[in-house]
Amino acid sequence: MRLSLIQLTVGSDFNDNFEKSKDLIQDALSYNPELILFPECFLYLSNSKKYSIDQNHESIIYFQNFAKKNNVNILLGSLPISDNKSVYNRSLVVDSNGSIISKYDKIHMFDVILRNNEIYKESDTFKSGNKLETFDINGWKFGHSICYDL
């Protein structure tokens, strides 16, 4: 299977990150991939629940339309998705028909005390998932994993 992996430096501006992602996914098509993969928190990295989106957000719809138009599968590494009760660090898989075929909520949050005693706790923002997920693309089986879940 031919894959395209996208890596980008995520800034604090959601719209800027979204525009960069749209440019990079367009560039990735030149490699004729069956699956394009984005990293964790590729549209926004924040420890604030106020920046979460729902699963019908325009950015997700954009990638669904892109997948269908270009007959390509996309793994949206992770996004801060809210279900009105909680916010999850969620990975979504969009198939070449533009349908979300799999979702996975990060299970193991990254909580750490840094050398300078600065504390970073994902668990203050995100609710942990509780289920492992797999998905199939073109006869290949994949498993989701986000960062600390490995």
Predicted regions and their residues:
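Substrate/cofactor-recognition hotspot
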Residues: N17
